[in-house]
Amino acid sequence: VVQNFSGPQRETGYMHGGISQLLLGDGSGLFTPVSSLESGLIVRGDATSLTINDLNGDGSPDFLIGVNNGNYELYINQFKTNSLSIRLPDYPKGRKFAGSKIWVYYVDNSVQLHQLNIGGGYLSQSAPIIFIGNKQNIDKIMVEWPDGLKNELDVEFLSSDISFLDK
């Protein structure tokens, strides 16, 4: 969570006293707060936007945070995990990623659904990428493009980063 209040009110003054809060999801819809000391996420000032990308290609989400009247702040994820990123390029063979759905099926019959959207941030756009916290025990991955076409990813070739460049 990044504080997102850039309009000061006369009676309260500027709203840039927070330092932000990292929340970790457990896959069931519940989130656990991580202290700033543990996460290293300390955004001083009036943070206005947060975009997520895999900037160093390790399969983990990295943050780029916009600060009102300040410089961008970059946070490279240092946690060592068995994660996976799936990147959908903007225009693979004429297809657009906005609205694409990605289903991740596990061997225990559980399913994760991800949908790529555009917008939702203040003058910012995250990369067309999803992150899967644990790539072990994945049975299959299906991508449904906005035009209805579906692709199945061969899970035998899972690495830390997958791109659908030629689909």
Question: Can you name each region flagged by the protein language model?
Answer:
Residues 3-167:
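Gly/Ser/Thr/Pro-enriched helix-cap/hinge segments flanking short amphipathic alpha-helices
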